[in-house]
Amino acid sequence: MRRLIIGIAVTLFGVQAFAQELPLKKDPIFQEGEVLTYKLKYGFLTAAEATIKVLGTDVKFDNKPTYRLSVDAQTSGTFDIFYKIRDHYDSYIDKTDLTPYFYQENIREASYRRQDKARFHQDDKKVVANKGTFATPTTQTFDLVSAYYFARSLDISKLKIGDKFKLNYFLGDEISALEIEYVGKENVKSKLGNIRCLKFSPSIKPGRVFRKDSKLYLWITDDGNRVPVKAQVEILVGSVTLEIKSAEGLKYPIGS
């Protein structure tokens, strides 16, 4: 279960941040006070839920103001009885270029415990974490939370079907890359209504969770908010779907 949730989390938070090839919009398309909630379903059963928040903070890095991004994830229902998860993540990002300065996580999954911190030095192309210093390939490397918000503010108006991009992210004491393909546009029924969406397909590694022929898809709103509303993937046994439950404090009306 832990490997599955990490895989879906990377997809949700990282799939859109295709790289520095695409310019940022003039202003972020999110704002303080935004709260998004999601549920993770295994077949017809809800296995886990997550809440993502943009919070105000007085914390500065290099004397620059930041946004605090906060994520809480936990198992639910029967899954909570057999494999209890209570994870918390924080990321502090620059208010101008939206790259991360600092990331911390508090992982509680059954008997497994992990607390980690990472300081991003973008200009020096390095990340300093609990287990050492890690070199990064570019001056834009993300944790799994900051990638999500950076990506939402990218200008993707010139994307063409079949375009592929890569994201560099720091997770589990290593720097990894994720390749994403733009698939096209589709309408998706969700708790927010029937919404026009952009569809992406990130690369996934077969193994203990995903089949060799598994395809993973993500749908984000084709509007001013760029909110992920659904993700779906087939695993070794069955399929997993991530669906949005609610969205509060959005900067723009859904569909605009």
What kind of feature is each model-predicted range?
Residues 15-19:
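Sec/Tat signal peptide C-region and signal peptidase I cleavage site
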Residues 20-120, 158-256:
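Acidic, serine/threonine-rich low-complexity disordered tracts
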Residues 4-13:
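Sec-dependent N-terminal signal peptides
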Residues 112-155:
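Hydrophobic, well-structured mid-protein blocks that either form specific transmembrane helices
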